[in-house]
Amino acid sequence: MIIIVTGTPGVGKTVASKKLSETLNLNYLSLSQFVIENKLYTEYDELRQSYIIDEDKVKEELEKIISASHLVIETIYPSLISTADLVVVLRKNPFSLYNELKGRGWADIKVAENVEAEILGVISQEAREAFKDKVCEVDTTEMSTEQILNKILNKQCDGPIEWLVDTKVQRFLEELDKIISSYENDI
């Protein structure tokens, strides 16, 4: 059994994935840690404080371990994984997510790009394109780990979640775009 838990940074992937793997007695794999430990990246982006992954190498190495494993895989890149029984996309209210990421001390550009990705549903769309009806979206806003886990185990999906129906979120997206645009010369 392969379960993918995905979503933008700050939505609760790590805690939910670890708890899910423990509850279902499955192994846990953080794709980010896997990439770093196996040097499956091409460079380090100083501006965003992130590694740029080598997608081909990641896919190749994942194939070696997925075929014979029962895993919960935590990732922001669901389409790099070739197979899954369930894909859980954790989502979070963009305003809450912004506060979460700012609280981590991340650079403004990194916060803005990640919150924009959440608003636009980038990871959700990627998951749906790769896994279609195996996708379950869960809104983690103001939820405990136990509540999130319960929704996953009972396949109580909230999605597809559309943040852009809220005019406040639309205005927030415009502000995020201004932040991102201010870094254009650095990108």
UniProtKB/Swiss-Prot annotation:
GO biological process: ribosomal small subunit biogenesis; rRNA processing
Chain sites annotated for binding ATP: 10, 12-15, 104
Any one Gene Ontology molecular-function term assigned to this protein's record: adenylate kinase activity
Keyword terms, alphabetized: ATP-binding, Kinase, Nucleotide-binding, Ribosome biogenesis, rRNA processing, Transferase
Catalysis performed (reactions): AMP + ATP = 2 ADP; ATP + H2O = ADP + phosphate + H(+)
Record region (LID): 103-113
Top EC class, one word: transferase
EC assignment: 2.7.4.3
Region of interest: NMP: 30-53
SUPFAM superfamilies with a match to the protein in the record: P-loop containing nucleoside triphosphate hydrolases
Gene3D superfamilies (UniProt xref): P-loop containing nucleotide triphosphate hydrolases (3.40.50.300)
Highest taxon listed in the record's lineage: Archaea
Disulfide cross-links: none
InterPro entries: Adenyl_kinase_AK6, P-loop_NTPase
Protein family per UniProt: Belongs to the adenylate kinase family. AK6 subfamily.
Subunit structure: Interacts with uS11. Not a structural component of 40S pre-ribosomes, but transiently interacts with them by binding to uS11.
Role, per record: Broad-specificity nucleoside monophosphate (NMP) kinase that catalyzes the reversible transfer of the terminal phosphate group between nucleoside triphosphates and monophosphates. Also has ATPase activity. Involved in the late maturation steps of the 30S ribosomal particles, specifically 16S rRNA maturation. While NMP activity is not required for ribosome maturation, ATPase activity is. Associates transiently with small ribosomal subunit protein uS11. ATP hydrolysis breaks the interaction with uS11.
Entry protein name: Putative adenylate kinase
Organism: Saccharolobus islandicus (strain M.16.27) (Sulfolobus islandicus)
